[in-house]
Amino acid sequence: MKKQKIVAIYGKGGIGKSSTASNVAAACAEAGKKVMIIGCDPKSDSSITLLRGKRIPTILDLLREGVDVQEKDVVFEGYAGVKCVEAGGPEPGIGCAGRGIIVAIQKLKSISGDLLKEQDLIIYDVPGDIVCGGFVAPVRKGYVNEAYVLTSGEYMPLYAANNICKGLSKIGMPLSGVICNSRNASREEEIVRKFSEEIGSQLMAFIPKRQIVQDCEREGYSVMEKAPDSDIAEVYRQLGKSILTNEKKVMASHLSDERLREMTK
């Protein structure tokens, strides 16, 4: 029986989780893996670049409309065969997005259980600067077997990453690695590598800042589809391979605020 990788990618809002998740999904699918991406952000944009700019109905929106949701209503095939799902979020100012994720995932499992089992890699793109009770649901409910944190080398993204590590440890979830999505900060790779080591984990990849990523997104494409020969596409391919073969999991420690500030000076 094949070993299925089910990963959650956490990180500060705006750090590039959706971009990273969608490009890694595309890279792994190009390599012949069966891949599904499940967007858990109320913005519902995790899969948009895999679908050439098309927004898809979210599970929670359809449930609110009283639709008898079926697999064909919420699972769409994107670039390279990636299966795309958006959980959606609550109406603005009403309800908890984290609890909504639980409802959406449970619905998906009930209508697409066989499809979920067929996947080699499932990526949950999870929002939030902290791991609250709701957003940690994919982990706590056993839907996820690996967690990664995405950050850059600046203080605030590292502060968020540090809090996420603290939250994961509190619920007994090991961390599988740290990913640096560069903002072109000074000594960025060195800082994030040091952070990874000091919390007991590993730096999985350093993703350099490239304008082509934003250019592709504006046109509704992933880098893997629009610019497959770019250097950044190769970075995503290597990160995908690393995630697929990674076996390291540690109960991450967290750093003091003083240490974070010292590290990012």
UniProtKB/Swiss-Prot annotation:
- Among its keywords, does the record have Iron? yes
Offer one example of a GO biological process linked to this entry: methanogenesis
EC numbers listed for it are 6.3.3.7
Q: What InterPro entries is this protein classified in?
A: NifH/chlL_CS, NifH/frxC, P-loop_NTPase
Sample GO molecular function, one term: oxidoreductase activity
Q: Repressor: is it a keyword of this entry?
A: no
Q: Which reaction does it catalyse?
A: Ni-sirohydrochlorin a,c-diamide + 3 AH2 + ATP + H2O = 15,17(3)-seco-F430-17(3)-acid + 3 A + ADP + phosphate
Q: How does it assemble?
A: Homodimer. The Ni-sirohydrochlorin a,c-diamide reductive cyclase complex is composed of a NifH homolog component CfbC and a NifD homolog component CfbD.
Function per UniProt: Involved in the biosynthesis of the unique nickel-containing tetrapyrrole coenzyme F430, the prosthetic group of methyl-coenzyme M reductase (MCR), which plays a key role in methanogenesis and anaerobic methane oxidation. Catalyzes both the six-electron reduction of the tetrahydroporphyrin ring system and the gamma-lactamization of the c-acetamide side chain of Ni-sirohydrochlorin a,c-diamide to yield 15,17(3)-seco-F430-17(3)-acid (seco-F430), the last intermediate in the biosynthesis of the coenzyme F430.
What is the protein's given name? Ni-sirohydrochlorin a,c-diamide reductive cyclase complex, component CfbC
Organism of origin is Methanosarcina acetivorans (strain ATCC 35395 / DSM 2834 / JCM 12185 / C2A)
